[in-house]
Amino acid sequence: MSDERTPQRSSGPRKKRPFQRRKVCRFCADKQVSIDYKDPRTLRYFISERGKIIPRRISGNCAKHQREITEAIKRARNIALLPIAGSHASQ
C-alpha cells in the first residue's frame, strides 16, 4: 500500500544548473561607499519596481550590509525620501 502512494522519480537525465559566480558585496569591496538613508539614489538600487527590498541572494550583499541597507531603506521610507509602494503602484 505505501508503494502506491509514493511518487516515482523519473529516471531521465537531470538538468544541470549553470554555475553562477557568487556576487561580491559592493560595500565590502569598496570601503568608501557608505550606506546612508539620506541618499535615495543608492538605496533605489536595492528596491524592486514593486517597492520591496531585494534579498541578499539576489543583490549579493553580505549579511551585515544587507541589515544596514534594510534599516536605511526603512528610515528613508519613514521620512518620505523613498516611496513605500512601487513606482507604478498608483496607476
Swiss-Prot record:
Signal peptide range: none
Pfam families: Ribosomal_S18
Keyword terms: Ribonucleoprotein, Ribosomal protein, RNA-binding, rRNA-binding
Region entry Disordered, spans: 1-21
Domain of life: Bacteria
GO molecular function: small ribosomal subunit rRNA binding; structural constituent of ribosome
GO biological process, one term: translation
A Gene Ontology cellular-component term: cytosolic small ribosomal subunit
Record-linked PROSITE patterns: RIBOSOMAL_S18
Basic residues biased stretches: 12-21
PANTHER family per the UniProt record, alphabetical: 30S RIBOSOMAL PROTEIN S18, SMALL RIBOSOMAL SUBUNIT PROTEIN BS18M
Assembly and interaction partners: Part of the 30S ribosomal subunit. Forms a tight heterodimer with protein bS6.
Protein family (similarity comment): Belongs to the bacterial ribosomal protein bS18 family.
Function as written in the Swiss-Prot or TrEMBL entry: Binds as a heterodimer with protein bS6 to the central domain of the 16S rRNA, where it helps stabilize the platform of the 30S subunit.
Protein name (database record): Small ribosomal subunit protein bS18
Organism annotation: Geotalea uraniireducens (strain Rf4)
Gene: rpsR
